[in-house]
């Protein structure tokens, strides 16, 4: 029996021009390039310019994705934007993106699941498309985490960067086989609020009337990450009858190279199948997966028909996985 799948038509990304290296950070705070690389794998990150907002990054990534897909912005009837750093409390940054693209129809809204945001947004758009409510969607992850960092906290300020990535999805009829269908094959989302104090921002417009800064218990996050990530990936494999040998590329959330390496090892995924961009992007939260997809697509690694495994974990905790055939 045939199925409607959300097929990826194209992807795109945008990174701010300013690059901050580990050496530049070491000149400001008590850290070193060796310390950062050894613990995280990060060597540099991009930082948004003054006056450059999350919506600006998202619009540029969306435009690149539309160009890659070969479709007009007016054909988009759904925009789902994953971000933890919106331009304003309201309206949604997605409507600013919609307006910036010259679209005044359909629906646009933000989704917040921190670093898991893109996987959550992908799953949300996929469900809308498969029901027939919408035909063609932009799924965007965009962040300006530099605005919520405590630049005196060496445990967090060295980790994050700014950027945006996007994919264009279209509802298409497929044969109905997880083994061959193009598009989003399966998604699995999880949350557990018992861990909300382990990674959070210590402020909020409705509680403290402040923006606040990112706070993290790094060891606690690391301790939970690998187990949660692998469990939700196993869920994806069990739901489809696929396995680690089936996938062509593993595109994880780019938080920390040690977490990525440990997850791939536990799942028996060969290192050469892992797409890594954390060294040059840092942790861009909801933007990291679409940024990595765009890199691997542009350099020719990801090709039509490839099966891609996505995973992410973020504050909350939230975590999720997706299997997508390009």
Curated annotation (Swiss-Prot):
GO terms for cellular component: cytoplasm. Its EC number is 2.3.1.180. Pathway: Lipid metabolism; fatty acid biosynthesis. Keywords: Acyltransferase, Cytoplasm, Fatty acid biosynthesis, Fatty acid metabolism, Lipid biosynthesis, Lipid metabolism, Multifunctional enzyme, Transferase. GO terms for biological process: fatty acid biosynthetic process. Pfam families: ACP_syn_III, ACP_syn_III_C. One of its GO terms (molecular function) is beta-ketoacyl-acyl-carrier-protein synthase III activity. Its main location: cytoplasm. Homodimer. Belongs to the thiolase-like superfamily. FabH family. HAMAP family: FabH. Catalyzes the condensation reaction of fatty acid synthesis by the addition to an acyl acceptor of two carbons from malonyl-ACP. Catalyzes the first condensation reaction which initiates fatty acid synthesis and may therefore play a role in governing the total rate of fatty acid production. Possesses both acetoacetyl-ACP synthase and acetyl transacylase activities. Its substrate specificity determines the biosynthesis of branched-chain and/or straight-chain of fatty acids. This is Beta-ketoacyl-[acyl-carrier-protein] synthase III. It comes from Bradyrhizobium diazoefficiens (strain JCM 10833 / BCRC 13528 / IAM 13628 / NBRC 14792 / USDA 110).
């Amino acid at each position: 029996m045939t199925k409607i799948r959300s097929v990826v038509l194209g992807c795109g990304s945008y990174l701010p021009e300013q690059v901050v290296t580990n050496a530049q950070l070491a000149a400001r705070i008590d850290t070193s390039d060796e310390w950062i690389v050894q613990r995280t794998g990060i060597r540099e990150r991009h930082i948004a310019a003054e006056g450059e907002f999350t919506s600006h990054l998202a619009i540029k990534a969306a435009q690149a994705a539309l160009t890659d897909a070969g479709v007009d912005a007016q054909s988009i009837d759904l925009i789902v934007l994953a971000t933890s750093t919106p331009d304003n409390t309201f309206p949604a940054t997605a409507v600013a993106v919609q307006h910036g693209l010259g679209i005044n129809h359909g629906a646009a809204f933000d989704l917040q699941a921190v670093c898991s945001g893109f996987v959550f947004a992908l799953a949300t758009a996929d469900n809308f498309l498969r029901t027939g409510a919408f035909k063609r969607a932009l799924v965007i992850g965009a962040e300006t985490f530099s605005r919520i960092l405590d630049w005196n906290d060496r445990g967090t300020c060295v980790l994050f960067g700014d950027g945006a990535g996007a994919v264009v999805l279209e509802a298409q009829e497929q044969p109905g086989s997880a083994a061959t269908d193009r598009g989003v094959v399966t998604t699995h989302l999880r949350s557990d609020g018992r861990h909300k104090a382990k990674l959070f921002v210590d402020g909020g417009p409705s509680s403290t009337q402040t923006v606040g800064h990112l706070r993290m218990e790094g060891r606690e996050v690391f301790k939970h990450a690998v187990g949660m990530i692998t469990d939700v990936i196993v869920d994806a494999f069990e739901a489809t009858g696929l396995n680690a040998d089936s996938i062509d590329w593993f595109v994880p959330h780019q938080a920390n190279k040690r977490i990525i390496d440990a997850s791939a090892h536990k799942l028996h995924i060969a290192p050469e199948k892992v797409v890594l961009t954390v060294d040059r992007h840092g942790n861009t939260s909801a933007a990291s997966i679409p940024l990595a997809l765009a890199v691997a697509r542009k350099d020719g690694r990801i090709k039509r028909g490839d099966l891609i495994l996505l995973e992410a974990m973020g504050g909350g905790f939230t975590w999720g996985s997706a299997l997508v055939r390009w």
